[in-house]
Amino acid sequence: MDSLAEQPSPDLPTLERMARMRKLWQWLALLVVSLLFAGALELAALPAALLIGPMLAAIVAGTNGATVRVPRLLFGAAQAIVGCLVAASISADIFPVFYREWPLFLGVVVATVTASSLLGWLISRWRILPGTTAVWGSSPGAATAMVLMAGAFGADQRLVAFMQYLRVIFVSMTAALVAKMWVDTSGIEIPPIIWFPPIDAQAFAATIGIALVGGLSGKICRLPSPYFLGTFIFGGVIHLGLGVEMQLPPWLLAISYAMVGWSIGLNFTRAILRHATRALPQIIASIVALIAFCGGLAFMISHLLGIDPLTAYLATSPGGMDSIAIIAAAAQNVDISFVMALQSARFLIVLLVGPSVARLVARSVRQ
């Protein structure tokens, strides 16, 4: 993760607009623009608005010469909170459904990971994006986790984030459009965010304790992306093994997402942004191809096993789990337990095997 602590780009002399501002004013400008972007994305009901908004604001700042950087300690703490979020999101309820349907679930996940890895391999092979970036960026889920881990394995986090969050937006919007073919979701309202809920002292203390112990354990064990992975592993064991509940209030998540978004976005330069823009058609084509492939899997599952078409589509959708859950809850005939079990299984397997698959595909690209 040290790659995010880079010094300002050598391009800086030509980008003096923000560099001439005092650091306090740079932070203030970044905060205001982040709030505007995040608010606009929330109003548009786009996924991951609280992370994408600050990241877009930081990209604007970074490409205009901003010299401020998120301190490593704050970035590490933000990663630990995201690790707690991922650990807390894994429900023990998925395991009975997974046990009952494991051949189907495993087949779908393996097929999806294989397809996404092939697309990443092609983008890398054609030198559209550098190194292993495309392999990490093509991962079908766990977007924030993949971005956090990518830097530790030598990929360009900025371009990985660009690919991953573009996929999240495309997948979520496509799922919403497909759902409208089966059910009218126009009357369904997303519940408002309660920014400052009552604090459960025990659950909140457990969250902070897990973040501290998990982050330190990851550092001691020299894990890649130690604060995230250490907290995720430790938190998963405590949450699933001991039944300890964690509380992650929205204000804490918003701060953590902003730290992650700023850390990535502030390291964008105009050269990187131009590179991402040039690669945009191929990246969009790969996302559309992955969505179409998963749609084909859903069609096969629906026809061969008699599963409701919308249930099959939502279950096999490559990412956007939060948005998928909202859409599934809005449809009366959807088997939400099946959808969330398969989505959670894909998320968990991608998280566990993603780094190994990325290294394997990257090695074949170099050969």
Regions found by a protein language model. Give the residues of each.
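Structural signature of multi-pass alpha-helical membrane transport proteins
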Residues: 3-74, 78-94, 115, 198, ...
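Membrane-embedded alpha-helical segments of transport systems
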Residues: 141-146, 161-182, 293, 322-323, ...
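Cytoplasmic-side transmembrane-helix entry/capping segments in multi-pass membrane proteins
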Residues: 71-83, 102-107, 128-139, 161-166, ...
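C-terminal transmembrane helix pair
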Residues: 290-295, 299-367
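Alpha-helical membrane segments and immediately flanking helix-loop junctions
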Residues: 126-166, 309-343
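Membrane-interface helix termini and inter-helical loops of multi-pass transporters
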Residues: 92-100, 181-199, 242-250, 274, ...
